[in-house]
Regions:
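Non-heme di-metal
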Residues: 2-225
Length: 225
């Protein structure tokens, strides 16, 4: 029913997909044509997609910091290196907590984890270790800035949708609070990376473009697979 209602309000000659249109159209303008059951179906589909990609993102972040910590921890000969290693471990601990949160939410909301976790397991570690090997402290921080900028924007988009779909019948309040808290910590990681002179790394600009594009592709894939 939900899909039929959406299909009926999309022009037949429209070049955008049903999924794209449903994201552009204000939820309340759709909801007034739907039954309580259909609203619940849309909400469940939204949460399934959101939690799958959020779990995948935090899993990847955990692996990035694992790779960085392993490389940076191999040489603690200077105060600067010890400082960076401590900082990376602090952010890693927060990412571990984020991952634990989504590992609990996945079964709670009956969401399906992405099938791409083995890929993100390897890719995240390689990205983290590689950035620290090639760029040291600034290289590691550059990756943090790029990834967290993308993730923060992603969480902001999700929060807007969850607020839009919030209702007395289907409350998203607790989930909004959780994602907002995680979003704020990701923003702190981004800002910390800038404070640690990520932008002074000579590869900062090209790496930022590549990593942000990779993150967006990973989000797109994890939502669907």
């Amino acid at each position: 029913m939900a899909s039929r209602v959406l299909s009926s309000i999309i022009p037949h000659n429209c070049c955008i997909t049903l999924h794209q249109y449903s994201r552009l159209l204000p939820y309340e303008s759709i909801a007034r044509n739907l039954s309580t059951r259909d609203k619940a179906v849309i909400r469940q589909q939204t949460l399934d997609r959101f939690l799958r990609v959020d779990h995948a993102g935090e899993y990847g972040a955990d692996r990035i910091y694992a790779g960085q910590a392993a490389v940076l921890g191999a040489d603690l000969s200077t105060e600067e290196k010890r400082h960076t290693h401590k900082l990376v471990n602090h952010m890693w601990e927060q990412e571990k907590e984020h991952l634990r949160t989504f590992e609990k939410l996945i079964p709670e909301y009956q969401a399906r984890p992405t099938a791409l976790l083995p890929l993100w397991h390897a890719a995240g570690y390689i990205l983290g270790a590689g950035s620290a090997l090639v760029g040291g402290s600034r290289g590691a921080m550059a990756i943090t800035v790029a990834v967290e900028a993308c993730i923060t924007e992603h969480y902001n988009d999700q929060i807007r949708v969850l607020i839009d779909q919030n209702s007395s019948e289907n409350s998203n309040e607790e989930l909004i609070k959780l994602i907002t808290k995680i979003r704020d910590e990701e923003q702190e990681h981004h800002d910390t990376g800038l404070e640690e002179e990520a932008e002074k790394w000579w590869l900062y600009e090209p790496v930022t473009v590549i990593v942000k594009s990779g993150c967006k592709a990973a989000i797109w894939l994890s939502e669907r697979i």
